[in-house]
From Swiss-Prot:
One of its GO terms (molecular function) is DNA-binding transcription factor activity, RNA polymerase II-specific. GO terms for cellular component: nucleus. This is Homeobox-leucine zipper protein HOX12. It comes from the Eukaryota. It is found in: Nucleus. Residues 58-117 bind DNA. Residues 107-168 form a coiled coil. Belongs to the HD-ZIP homeobox family. Class I subfamily. It comes from Oryza sativa subsp. japonica. Gene3D superfamilies: Homeodomain-like (1.10.10.60). Keywords: Coiled coil, DNA-binding, Homeobox, Nucleus, Transcription, Transcription regulation.
Length: 239
């Protein structure tokens, strides 16, 4: 077999060209055209969605309030926060809006008003909290100062107590020699014969001891005797 025959057996398309099969060629072309038509054809759902989006944009534009309508609704909201159904219908008729649109506007406005009140209340609470924290810091600082002063006072008190204890212990030994004025007012004096002879004292009293009494002790002694009723007897003895 020659080379051409081998190729015809292996590749029949070369042996039988497209002109030999006209029906197959036309059917393939129709399939391609049908595919192109399917690609170009838009689904009804997509078309409806596009139409809905365009209609939604138009409705959104219609729902937008003018400045005058917004001011009128604000004035109405200041007077009454929540509207009844007849009042909503009346406002909608006056403004040329839908009653549902007016109800939604008032609902959103109440939510914004409540949020604003909460923010103001939070600001007040935050300010009060900061003031309390600052006052607490001042009190803690004052407490530390008072603790330092108390420690200084306790230290000074301990020093004074130590000094007082040392003073009391040192003076205890020397305090034993002290005596009352009355007991120290009397002292024994030895009799001197030369002095006694000058004043004419009898020889019998030479061996006696003389007792010296101070003026203060003498006055006290005389007062005690007067209180006991012995003044007359003493003067009688000396008279």
């Amino acid at each position: 077999m020659s080379r051409e025959e081998d190729e015809k057996l292996l590749f029949p398309s070369f042996a039988f060209p497209a002109e030999c099969f006209p029906e197959a060629a036309t059917s393939g072309g129709e399939q391609k055209k049908a595919r192109q038509r399917r690609r170009r054809k838009v689904k009804p759902e997509a078309a409806a969605a596009l139409a809905g989006e365009s209609g939604g944009d138009e409705q959104a534009k219609k729902r937008r309030l003018s400045d005058e309508q917004a001011r009128f609704l604000e004035m109405s909201f200041k007077k009454e926060r929540k509207l009844e159904t007849p009042r909503k219908v009346q406002l909608a008729a006056e403004l040329g809006l839908d009653a549902k649109q007016v109800a939604v506007w008032f609902q959103n406005r109440r939510a914004r008003h409540k949020s604003k009140l909460m923010e103001e209340e939070f600001a007040k609470l935050r300010s009060a909290h900061d003031a309390v924290v600052l006052q607490n810091c001042h009190l803690e600082t004052e407490l530390l100062k008072l603790k330092e002063r108390l420690a200084d006072v306790e230290e000074e008190k301990a020093k004074l107590a130590a000094v007082a204890a040392a003073t009391t212990g040192g003076g205890g030994g020397g305090g034993g020699g002290s005596s009352s004025p009355t007991s120290s007012s009397f002292s024994t004096v030895t009799y001197h014969p030369a002095l006694a002879g000058q004043f004419g004292v009898e020889a019998a009293a030479e061996e006696a001891d003389l007792t010296y009494m101070s003026e203060y002790a003498y006055n006290s002694y005389m007062l005690e005797l007067a209180a006991a009723g012995y003044c007359g007897g003493v003067y009688d003895q000396f008279s």
